[in-house]
């Protein structure tokens, strides 16, 4: 039973390593593709929401966003109502690589779930969603500087 999170971690690290290798030619490394995909799918998202969506701290998100911006994959544009708020958008370069990133994600999902019935796919999706929701409570708690009691 204790091996479940280890299995999830191994799967996540393996998929991340595969993506980092395959996207190296695009100069997308260290999970930057995750940010680019979310920005493409949520144009105008703000940095804080993106960090929350990916489940990273603001500093980690800021570094990745800065690098993507310097590489020309995304741009920050001021909000029309509040110029202090910067919204994130993919550039033409970012839009151009998105289909490849999407295909890789679909392929990885297909490989990961090969041999599963439709019912099993629905079940694993529902169970993982519940696991994520459980972990999100702790994430929100410790993010505020609290310590879990274990």
UniProtKB/Swiss-Prot annotation:
What superkingdom does the record give? Bacteria
Q: Name one GO molecular function term.
A: DNA-binding transcription factor activity
Pfam families associated with the record: MarR
Q: Entry's InterPro entries?
A: HTH_MarR-typ, Tscrpt_reg_MarR-type_CS, WH-like_DNA-bd_sf, WH_DNA-bd_sf
Q: Which SUPFAM superfamilies does the annotation name?
A: Winged helix' DNA-binding domain (SSF46785)
Residue ranges of the annotated DNA-binding region, renumbered to this chain: 47-70
UniProt keyword annotations, A-Z = DNA-binding, Transcription, Transcription regulation
Domain HTH marR-type, residue spans? 1-133
> What is the protein name for this chain?
Uncharacterized HTH-type transcriptional regulator YybA
**What is the organism field in this record?**
Bacillus subtilis (strain 168)
Task: List the lineage, top down.
Answer: Bacteria, Bacillati, Bacillota, Bacilli, Bacillales
């Amino acid at each position: 039973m204790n091996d479940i999170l280890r299995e999830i971690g191994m799967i996540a690290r393996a998929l991340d390593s595969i993506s980092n290798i395959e996207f190296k030619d695009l100069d997308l490394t260290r999970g930057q593709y995750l940010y680019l995909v979310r920005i493409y799918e949520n144009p105008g998202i703000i940095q804080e929401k993106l960090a929350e969506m990916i489940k990273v701290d603001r500093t980690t998100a800021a570094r990745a966003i800065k690098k993507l911006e310097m590489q020309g994959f995304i741009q920050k544009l001021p909000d029309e109502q509040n110029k202090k708020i910067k919204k994130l958008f993919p550039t033409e370069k970012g839009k151009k690589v998105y289909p490849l990133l999407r295909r890789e994600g679909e392929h990885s999902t297909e490989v990961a779930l090969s041999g599963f019935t439709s019912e099993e796919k629905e079940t694993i999706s529902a169970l993982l969603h519940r696991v994520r929701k459980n972990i999100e409570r702790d994430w929100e708690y410790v993010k505020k500087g609290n310590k879990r009691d274990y």
